[in-house]
Amino acid sequence: MEVRGLQPKRQKTFARKHLVIVESPAKAQTIEKYLGTQYVVRASMGHVIDLPKSRLAIDIEHDFQPEYITVRGRAQCLKELRTLSKQSLQVFLASDRDREGEAIAYHLAQSIQAYCDTPIKRIVFNEITPHAIRAAIGHPVPIDTAKVNAQKARRVLDRLVGYHLCPLLWHKVKNGLSAGRVQSVALRLICEREVEVKRFVPEEYWTVEGTFEKDKKSFSALLILIQGKKAVFKSKQEATSAIGLFSQSEARVSQIRSFEKNVRPKQPFTTSTLQQCAANRLGFTSRKTMQVAQQLYEGVSLGTHRVGLITYMRTDSVRVSEAAVKEVRAWIATHFSDALPGTPNRYAAKGKSQDAHEAIRPTYVAHTPERIKAHLTRDQIRLYTLIWERFVASQMTDARVRSLTFEITAGPAVFSATETQVIEQGFYRVLKMLSPKDLSKAVLPPTKEGEVVALHNVQSVQHFTQGPVRYTDASIVKMLEEKGIGRPSTYAPTISVLLDRYYVTRIQKQLMPTPLGKVISDLLTTYFHDVVDVSFTARMESKLDEVEEDKIKWNCVIADFYPAFSEKVSTVMKDLNSMRGVFDEKTDVVCSQCGDTMVKKLGRFGFFLACGKFPECRNTQPVPLAKCPRPACDGNIVGKKTRGRKEFYGCTRFPVCDFVTHFKPTFAVCPQCRCFLVEKSNRRVGTYTACVNPECRYVSPTRKNLSLGKEAVLDGSHRGAQDKGAVQHYE
């Protein structure tokens, strides 16, 4: 019987689409705009499958097989990706094309295939642009299992080293410490450099400079020979005696030498050279450089659309695609046609370069810094400018410079003056932020050999020999790369771990080991020399590269290393005496809660004071650095941090006393007003100490400011722009 008016319920249908899985939401947002409505782009938020943090999870008895689990907090994300995969026509895995990205793609594929039979494809690209994404969709590739195995070997190796060394450090030194295959080598390098710095004894020496004039144009020259001998003097008296030998002599230009040379543009950035340049030019830490580069790579809104501005930023290759070379040459031909070489410039890859990616370059050279700066943050535009200038310059003609040297003879003395001028701009024409700083303007007057020049003034200048300098972010990255330690993706995290663990501190951009870092490094160097040996670590990196090239099996690398290492750990754990409490130091500070004396201890973030009756009394407080200089205030000055983690120094009696300074107090006392001294620095005299009291102009004498005189420090460096707002509410 038919019942009119009743219709069968219509089943809801899901419009099946293509699913693209990337690592980050920002990357997903950019790519989704390129692909249109037939694609859904989702982020895995990094690894969804990894080793558990709570246990070793390596089956040593069965070829070191890792026991993976779903990463804590990622189960819901993985569930959603599986559900979307089942509803999709096909799945594209678009994680990064390095080892970590390949492992992410592999684990996602395994998880999805266990849940549904939706076709899964791997796509790779070097830049996030519409053309690159569509080309990758049209040309999927197999998952690189050799690269996955290299990541697995690295992960297992680091887990074995960490999970054996960390308990040893906890048991013998203190809880919460860590050690790692790469970070411990970097720590050793920093500690060894610190020893070299401490051992170095500066030696005084003097040079002589003369001021000459020709046709009313003055120029300076350095005394290089006196009576046929090198003009370097051990004391001011020797320099003064030498001046007396020629001060009344006639000065003539005895020789003029001129030569020209080509200056080749530098190759495009790799991860290492980008971090070094950003540190030197912009003052960026390695971590900040990579964070900003990640933002530029994943995509930035340019008003009407979102675009990835640079290619993948973790690379050790200087290779550039032919399409990019063609594009930049067309741009140069339009804007600097006379600086376009006849053929493209080619740059040789280093021996250990993986060459999987291109060099770091802008995705569109037409996006000049001036054109897009309104859409970028200050940090983004500064880093982008470095990358853009370096890439464009790399495909321009050589610059040509002329070096002109005068030798001037005055009696038994020979002076030398040199200037370097650019005679053909070449690639210098495009450089603004990266313009060279070592090229001088014309300073030497036109003259001929044999002509007389007037010697107006002679002065002796004090110097001290320069010893080894502490590592900075730039120099430690350069050293790690030169030694073959780590890979582009590990440089910034390695430095960050050392800082976060308080093994190293960064003071005025210099990396200095803490007492804790020195103890850890000494212990590991003494008992685990192979693990923290530079050449051993470099060889291990080479073996991981061979795994990636499918030349050796990943578990063979582990098997060659683990037995001897495990035996060594057991021996040290048994024989090494405990070092717990080695940093503890009794003080005369009284506990404010129980009246017992406080003990100076070393924690994760530096020294602090703890009650001597711990655990009965758990009172802690910062270590006092100085007495508060305020009249009638009995508080102490301690280190504090703002919400933005910037350090400053204030009184313990805040808010009753609101004394604040941003300069680090020393334990020294001003001999004039009895306030404490603080550390300061400027480019002219380096680091020095000065009184915190703005009414007192005391500056402690140092080797550097002795050579310039006290006035050189006070002429605006000590009481200048740097001091404004540095000491607040003093009166």
UniProtKB/Swiss-Prot annotation:
Pfam families reported in the protein's UniProt record: Topoisom_bac, Toprim, Zn_ribbon_Top1
**Would I find Transmembrane helix among this entry's keywords?**
no
Entry annotation: catalytic residues: Y312
Q: Per the record, GO CC terms?
A: chromosome
List the residues marked with site Interaction with DNA. Answer: H47, R154, R155, D158, Y163, W170, R314, R501
Task: Work out whether the entry's keyword set contains Aminoacyl-tRNA synthetase.
Answer: no
Requisite cofactors: Mg(2+)
Keyword field: DNA-binding, Isomerase, Magnesium, Metal-binding, Repeat, Topoisomerase, Zinc, Zinc-finger
Known catalysed reaction(s)?
A: ATP-independent breakage of single-stranded DNA, followed by passage and rejoining
Determine the domain of life of the protein's source: Bacteria
Residue ranges of domain Topo IA-type catalytic in the record = 144-569
Provide the residue positions that the database annotates as binding Mg(2+). Answer: E23, D96
Q: Assembly and interactions?
A: Monomer.
Protein's name in the database = DNA topoisomerase 1
Q: Which organism is it from?
A: Treponema pallidum (strain Nichols)
Source species taxonomy? Bacteria, Pseudomonadati, Spirochaetota, Spirochaetia, Spirochaetales
The gene that this protein is the product of is topA
